[in-house]
Each structure stands twice: as C-alpha cells, then as structure tokens.
C-alpha cells in the first residue's frame, strides 16, 4: 500500500509542475486533463501526508517518553501518545479506501432506460412510477432531466422511456439501479383484491462524449418517419421523427419531437451512448468472471429489488437490505439505499485490492 501511496504522491508533485508549464497552460485539453487528474489525487495525497506527520509525531513522543524522568512530563507525553495512536489505524483505513480505483464513469451524466417487462399493463404503470421516482430524486440533487424517447402505454405509464439526467456524479449514485425491479401490489382494476407481481427493467448508461467513441458516418442508417402518439394518432404532420441504426451492431435510437434537427442530435447522442455501453458491458463481463461484485453482476435481467406495497417494504436482494419506507422511497428518497450499496461496493473493491484482483 505504501509503495502505491509514494507513486501517487510523486505523480501529484509532477502534475503540480506540469500545471505551471506555460505550454500546458496554453493547451486547453491538456490543462483540463491534468487538472482533473490532480484533483482526483489530491485527497489521497493530503491523507497520506497527514498519516506521515502523525506517525512521525508518535515516534518522537515514544522516544521522549523513554527519556523523560519527570512524572508530570511523562503524563503529558502519555496524553499525546493516547491522542496520536488511534489516528494511525483510522488514517490507514482512509488511505485504503482512497486507493480503491475510482470508476472513471462516476462523474458522468446518466442515460436511463426504463421498460415495462412481465405483467402487462401493471408493468408499464410501474415503469411510469420508477420514472417519477428517479425524477423526484434528481430534483432533490439539483440535477436536470431531459426526455429522449418515449413509448407511452394505453393504460398509463410507459412501455419504455429513455431520458438523460444531467448533473455531476449522477452515474456514481444511479449506476446501482441497473437491473430488474419487481413490484407486488393490488392493481386498481383488481376487484378481488389479489396482489399481482410485475417487473420493469432499468438500464443505466454513462453518457458518452465524442472523444470517447468514434462512429463512422458510413456505419449509420438514418431514416425519417411520421411520429404517432398513443393509439396511432399523428402528433405531427411532417416526417420529423428520426431513427438511426448503427449497422455493425444493429443498435437503434429514435427521437420524435417536432424539430427534425433536434431529433437527429438527440438520437445520435443516444445511439453513441448505447454503442459505448455495449462495449462497456463486454469489459465488465470479463471482470465479473474474475470476481463477483457485492452489489450484483450488473446484468439487466438480474432481479435487484422488490417493492411490496401492502407491507410498505422495499428489499434490495443484492445486499439483503430491507427498508419499511416504500412510501418515501417511491417519492425519490433513495439516499439510504444508495449509501448502503456504495459501502458494499467499496468493501468488495477493497477485498479485491487486498487479493490483488484490482
């Protein structure tokens, strides 16, 4: 661990020098890249330096204790030792956590896709409830939501909806929502009062930037068509909706607002994100073969959570967490679940670091 910390500190010092170089300062891309890297390393370096200082103070105090002959002086040094000693394991634990490789996607915006799955109309209604839940959570975080694609269901909710959440750290908090969500409740149309079980799937994709993926124009098939609303009614009179297909992968994205130019931009952004995500999924699958994560496999068919309305209970199956606050959670109060999943992921990564897997 300490060898790694020395390397981190050396790199931090090197970045300080680079950021003072006039050639770097005049290069916007390099300046942004190095500034971000330095910011990412700063806390680790500060904690490591604090650790070295405390350790040195403790060693000096122990040495003074051996030389002190006066009882009052010994008592004073003993107090200092008792103050310094517990700080060592605390700082070591912090350093271990800071050495855990940060997910490079954590600071990104998020593209979320929710689909009604098993359960017919109830599944679509539940998909709408999940969209509302994430919208409320995003509002509380001060994030902005922009709807990309929708396919509204006839009896409420969505057959599918894709939207982007714009805000720093959105992916770090919402990445754990990836998977199948199950709901148990009595539908409003159910006269016999029987509990029905339905599911909706949630896909969480980090928004991709142009520099991260290159898509050739010749690999795209772009089509325009007339957008239709629920029940087949035409909502615009021109062929403004856009469908873009990435020919090598077969991945498709659509957008159906009134402006064809905006639709093309939105559909292309969504397509790039989906193509990038497909590559990311491949890489993550390789890692999960080496080690199963404490917060699930990340597979979108994996059942991750159950929402039991009659018992006001939400259970996250990946970490065995049960909370009797469903009424609050569906209103966007996701903090308790997200915090527990974050801790589980950190613990898992720390174990992997100790085992030499990371």
UniProtKB/Swiss-Prot annotation:
Key words of the record: Cytoplasm, Methylation, Protein biosynthesis
Entry keyword annotation includes Glycoprotein: no
SMART domains linked: PCRF
Subcellular location: Cytoplasm
Primary localisation category: cytoplasm
Keyword Aminoacyl-tRNA synthetase: no
Modified residues (N5-methylglutamine): 233
Entry's Gene Ontology cellular component terms: cytoplasm
Modification(s) after translation: Methylated by PrmC. Methylation increases the termination efficiency of RF1.
Biological role: Peptide chain release factor 1 directs the termination of translation in response to the peptide chain termination codons UAG and UAA.
Family statement: Belongs to the prokaryotic/mitochondrial release factor family.
Protein name listed in UniProt: Peptide chain release factor 1
